Amino acid sequence: MKKNLLIVAVVTGLVMMGNSTKAQMKIGYVSLQELIPTMPEYRKADTALNDYQTALQQNFEDMRREYAEKDSLLSSKDTVKFTRAQIEIKRREVGELLIKLQGWNQQAQQLYQQKQQDLIAPIQKKAVDAIQAVAKENGYTYVLNKETLLVSPPAEDMLPLVKKKLGIK
């Protein structure tokens, strides 16, 4: 009898503890894809990235123009003015420029991605820090990224609270 009473007491305690844990859990979600573009820092970074991309494109155009000029010089009748050694040097220069041009797209893409990472990483960190602060202030147990959810339990959208924390209207 005492054994049965003890089992009932333990089971009742576990059930009560499980219910109180569920009652204390507060879930929220936020969309980083919606939050980050609304931040003033993002607009500045986006402008800087556009300027950087324009500079990279201009650099490519300058290299392409230089290649076209040197290549056309070798193709023209003016090559009779040059010695064989000079022609060979110019051909080598044209070949090097062609190789540089062919690799430029990949190099420019890597440069752009690095610049993007350098500019966006601090903005993402600021957003995540604000989300963590709002979660702590409002007693959220879990905060989920809205974009990664297919199915989720009922939760509160924290985006307005985070925007308020960041001073975004």
Regions found by a protein language model. Name each.
Residues 17-23:
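Sec/Tat signal peptide C-region and signal peptidase I cleavage site
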Residues 24-169:
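Amphipathic, charged alpha-helical segments and their helix-to-coil junctions
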Residues 16-17, 133:
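Short, flexible, glycine/charge-rich loop motifs used to bind or transfer phosphoryl groups or to couple energy/partner
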Residues 8-16:
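Bacterial N-terminal signal peptides
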Residues 1-5:
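Positively charged n-region of N-terminal signal peptides that target proteins for export
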